[in-house]
Amino acid sequence: MPFVRIDALRADAERLDALGRAVHDALVETIGFPPNDRFQVLTSHDGTSGMLRYDDYLGVPRDDGIVYVALTMRSGRTPAQKQALYRRIAELAEEYAGTEPRNVVITLTENGSADWSFGHGVAQYVEG
């Protein structure tokens, strides 16, 4: 189960939906998550009351098309799987939402089975 947060600057509902689909499709294609395993928070920031900050870190020029993708999932993926995931997210974000790959910033945080509850106050992966 991935938990996905996507933050974009001045994105309308259509663009947010396209970004959410891009990330979900990439997770299904590269990591093998089930298609019905979707937990996402999609947020647009207007640039006034909500902002995104960025610079040209590591020589990557970014602009107001910036998108932050924060993924949380159970541990167990190889570096090669993660690289394939990042690449596919960037490709699909461009295809679905017109977001340039240089503007897609991704973080992936891993944790353990006891760190998830899908409702009822139960850690389903632990109690099985």
Please name every model-derived segment.
Residues M1-G128:
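Interaction-mediating elements
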